């Protein structure tokens, strides 16, 4: 749902049907990689949205979202490498790149950015709660929603 809000029309299918041991999921409509830092951080935000949605609807933290958190953590490692997410402060010589100090610095930045993106996902869901609930209702009724179904639901919630 967050993906559809951030990039309308980008979600091809949403389902609650199981596949290869995973219950439910969604597929992006296009198979392109993030072209810039903003798009990349949108991907991390979408990854954290499931956990944020459970918190918003049920008022509890989703302790079963470990796979999502692990994926977000991996994406943040990529962000730090490819988009200089750790900044240039404290960069050490090549001989000392993996020092404890540098790793600790990077983990603190990554943790803060994950927290920021989680709050962003929560805010998007909160601001679009009627859309979220309508998608939830549609999935309960039909089990699978296509891009066209999401567009109709979104139109009805505006």
Where do the protein language model's features map onto the residues?
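Soluble catalytic regions of large protease machineries
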Residues: 3-158
């Amino acid at each position: 749902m967050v993906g559809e809000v951030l990039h309308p029309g980008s979600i091809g299918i949403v389902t609650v049907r199981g596949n290869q041991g995973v219950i439910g999921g969604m597929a992006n409509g296009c198979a392109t990689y993030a072209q810039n830092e903003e798009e990349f951080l949108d991907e991390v935000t979408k990854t954290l949205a499931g956990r944020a949605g459970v918190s918003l609807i049920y008022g509890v933290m989703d302790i079963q979202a470990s796979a999502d958190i692990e994926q977000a953590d991996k994406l943040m490692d990529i962000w730090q490498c490819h988009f200089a997410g750790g900044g240039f402060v404290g960069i050490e010589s090549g001989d000392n790149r993996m020092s404890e100090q540098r790793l600790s610095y990077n983990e603190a930045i990554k943790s803060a950015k994950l927290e920021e993106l989680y709050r962003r996902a929560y805010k998007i869901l909160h601001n679009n709660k009627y859309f979220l609930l309508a998608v939830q209702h549609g999935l309960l009724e039909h089990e699978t929603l296509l891009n066209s179904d999401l567009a109709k639901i979104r139109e009805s919630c505006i």
